[in-house]
Amino acid sequence: MPMFIVNTNVPRASVPEGFLSELTQQLAQATGKPAQYIAVHVVPDQLMTFSGTSDPCALCSLHSIGKIGGAQNRNYSKLLCGLLSDRLHISPDRVYINYYDMNAANVGWNGSTFA
């Protein structure tokens, strides 16, 4: 059930076609979870600053049932900052990513939970 959310001040017109699909496939590979359970939400055109400037930046979160922790999070940060840099031209030092290890009983899907 990984869910990746990107809030960014990058304009919608600068988000390349296929970017969400690419994030989905890369996260599936990185987490080892099926792409069918991965949700990606990119929210462009946000009023944001980072380090006091409105240069391109992103505030992100990755929620997952398991697969969250020290070494894994460093790998995700490298992957996701790389994609945000390559595709949206956001410098990695202008990205924060918060990681959330979700309890399966606290994640609803398809009329039930993952527990």
UniProtKB/Swiss-Prot annotation:
Function: Pro-inflammatory cytokine involved in the innate immune response to bacterial pathogens. The expression of MIF at sites of inflammation suggests a role as mediator in regulating the function of macrophages in host defense. Counteracts the anti-inflammatory activity of glucocorticoids. Has phenylpyruvate tautomerase and dopachrome tautomerase activity (in vitro), but the physiological substrate is not known. It is not clear whether the tautomerase activity has any physiological relevance, and whether it is important for cytokine activity.
Tissue: Expressed in a wide variety of organs including brain, spleen, liver, muscle and kidney.
Name of the gene encoding the protein in the UniProt record: Mif
Assembly: Homotrimer. Interacts with CXCR2 extracellular domain. Interacts with the CD74 extracellular domain, USO1, COPS5 and BNIPL.
One record GO biological process: positive regulation of phosphorylation
Keyword Signal: no
GO cellular component terms attached to this protein's record: cell surface; cytoplasm; extracellular region; extracellular space; plasma membrane
Lineage of producing organism: Eukaryota, Metazoa, Chordata, Craniata, Vertebrata
Binding of substrate, residues: K33, I65, N98
The entry's keywords: Acetylation, Cytokine, Cytoplasm, Immunity, Inflammatory response, Innate immunity, Isomerase, Secreted
Protein known as: Macrophage migration inhibitory factor
Provenance organism: Rattus norvegicus
Gene3D superfamilies the record matches: Macrophage Migration Inhibitory Factor
Reaction(s) catalysed by this chain's protein: 3-phenylpyruvate = enol-phenylpyruvate; L-dopachrome = 5,6-dihydroxyindole-2-carboxylate
Compartment annotation: Secreted; Cytoplasm
Pfam (any one): MIF
Record PTM N6-succinyllysine, positions in chain: K78
PTM annotation (N6-acetyllysine): residues: K78
UniProt record similarity statement: Belongs to the MIF family.
Known EC number: 5.3.2.1, 5.3.3.12
Active-site annotation: P2 (proton acceptor)
